[in-house]
């Protein structure tokens, strides 16, 4: 009887991702597990098919061989690479596991692998002021915690917990398929290495339950968008009582209506009046520490930069603060009265003529350049 396509068994397309394969396996294995379908031969066979499919598709090397050669890659006595003999079905994975296990303190069988829980991610948005000064934020995360009823064992109190007879407590099965030595999660105990007489009613034998947890996160001064804060042991609890993973808080700093940040420096545009630009004066500039006086020299133009040292963001590494860089924008007056317009006309007239290059050198230079351009253009037409 021809074997079914492994992707078809898991209800997937050939290009399925690792996560999709893992999710499909967990869903189908739970649905067709013998404990939930006692006495059903059909469910038992389906369960075996699911585990066999995942054993291949869940391993990158074996999946690549299957995609290229199909089931022939795992047949005894040969396969894709032309190897013969099949070594009489000996399980070399177990053989080497036992040898090296003895050398390093323990056999290859009977040892359950302790796998800590999953790492979690939490995206946290803060203001620029909070990023610069540092703050403490209260957050709530969705996580997996060890079941309080069974202490993470997955068994009802007083229930027998025995070593899984299929994997001998290791939680994994090794076998040879063709020229591959495979290792997969034990289909009987799902990797726990244990056989539970009565599963915990609270967690249904999983040992973990979904939970909302409130945490207080200290944000150090100087953080920026993309920085990650690691909270060790605040991730999901591990299976079978294993330690929890970590929580990574990813920082996102909101845009500010005045300042722009580039590393440890802050930038802002400072508008000044036409008169202040021409005559000079003193203005107030906003900083994250409050208002600061800034002297504007006479004849200041738009685009002039003023650097206020130490008014930026303190580096999380060196502790030294960057600078605040102010870019001047000379504001053109609007909504003028007739009298104000008349005064500006008189000022304009007084600046024209022979003294234009003295009072407005850029305008004078521009007009001279335009005149020369058209003069040369006229000569080339002749």
UniProtKB/Swiss-Prot annotation:
One GO molecular function term of this record is: unfolded protein binding
Which residue intervals define the domain J in the entry?
Answer: 5-70
Quote the subunit structure annotation.
Homodimer.
Q: Which gene encodes it?
A: dnaJ
Instruction: Please provide, in alphabetical order, the Gene Ontology terms of the cellular component aspect for this entry.
Output: cytoplasm
The alphabetical list of record keywords is: Chaperone, Cytoplasm, DNA replication, Metal-binding, Repeat, Stress response, Zinc, Zinc-finger
Give the matching Pfam families. Answer: DnaJ, DnaJ_C, DnaJ_CXXCXGXG
Gene source species: Haemophilus influenzae (strain ATCC 51907 / DSM 11121 / KW20 / Rd)
> Biological process GO terms, please?
chaperone cofactor-dependent protein refolding; DNA replication; protein refolding; response to heat
Q: How many and how are cofactors bound here? A: Binds 2 Zn(2+) ions per monomer.
Residues that coordinate or bind Zn(2+) 2: 164, 167, 186, 189
- Provide the cofactor list for this protein: Zn(2+)
The UniProt record lists the keyword Repeat: yes
ZnF region ranges: CR-type: 134-212
Where would you find this protein in the cell? Answer: Cytoplasm
Tell me, in one coarse class, where this protein mainly resides: cytoplasm
Q: Which family does it belong to?
A: Belongs to the DnaJ family.
**UniProt function note:** Participates actively in the response to hyperosmotic and heat shock by preventing the aggregation of stress-denatured proteins and by disaggregating proteins, also in an autonomous, DnaK-independent fashion. Unfolded proteins bind initially to DnaJ; upon interaction with the DnaJ-bound protein, DnaK hydrolyzes its bound ATP, resulting in the formation of a stable complex. GrpE releases ADP from DnaK; ATP binding to DnaK triggers the release of the substrate protein, thus completing the reaction cycle.
Start and end residues of the CXXCXGXG motif repeats are 147-154, 164-171, 186-193, 200-207
Which protein are we looking at? Chaperone protein DnaJ
């Amino acid at each position: 009887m021809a074997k079914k396509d492994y992707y078809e068994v898991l209800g997937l397309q050939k290009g399925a991702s690792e996560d999709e394969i893992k999710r499909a396996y967990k869903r189908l294995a739970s649905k067709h597990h013998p404990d939930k379908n006692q006495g059903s031969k059909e469910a038992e066979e389906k369960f075996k098919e699911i585990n066999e499919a995942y054993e291949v598709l869940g391993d990158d090397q074996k999946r690549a061989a299957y995609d290229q050669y199909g089931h022939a890659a795992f047949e005894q006595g040969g396969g894709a690479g032309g190897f013969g003999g099949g070594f009489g079905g000996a399980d070399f994975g177990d053989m080497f596991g036992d040898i090296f296990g003895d050398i390093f303190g323990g056999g290859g069988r009977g040892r359950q692998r302790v796998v800590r829980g999953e790492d979690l991610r939490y995206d946290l948005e803060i203001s620029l002021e909070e990023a610069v000064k540092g703050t403490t934020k209260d957050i709530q995360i969705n996580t997996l915690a060890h079941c309080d009823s069974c202490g993470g064992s997955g068994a009802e109190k007083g229930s027998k917990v025995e070593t899984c007879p299929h994997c001998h407590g290791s939680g994994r099965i090794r076998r040879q398929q063709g020229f591959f030595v495979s290792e997969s999660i034990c289909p009987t105990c799902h990797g726990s290495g244990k056989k539970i007489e009565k599963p915990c009613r609270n967690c249904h034998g999983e040992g973990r339950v979904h939970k909302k947890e409130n945490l207080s996160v200290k944000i150090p001064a100087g953080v920026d968008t993309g920085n990650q804060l690691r909270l060790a042991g605040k991730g999901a609890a591990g299976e079978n009582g294993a330690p929890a993973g970590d929580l990574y808080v990813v920082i996102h700093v909101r845009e500010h209506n005045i300042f722009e940040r580039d590393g440890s420096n802050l930038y802002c545009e400072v508008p000044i009046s036409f008169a202040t630009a021409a005559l000079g004066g003193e203005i107030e500039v906003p900083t994250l520490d409050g208002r600061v006086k800034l002297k504007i020299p006479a004849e200041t133009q738009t685009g002039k930069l003023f650097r206020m040292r130490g008014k930026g963001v303190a580096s999380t590494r060196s502790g030294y603060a960057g600078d605040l860089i102010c870019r001047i924008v000379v504001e053109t007056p609007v909504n003028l009265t007739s009298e104000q317009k008349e005064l500006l006309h008189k000022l304009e007239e007084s600046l024209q003529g022979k003294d234009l290059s003295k009072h407005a050198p850029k305008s004078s230079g521009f007009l001279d350049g335009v005149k020369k351009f058209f003069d040369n253009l006229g000569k080339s037409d002749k």
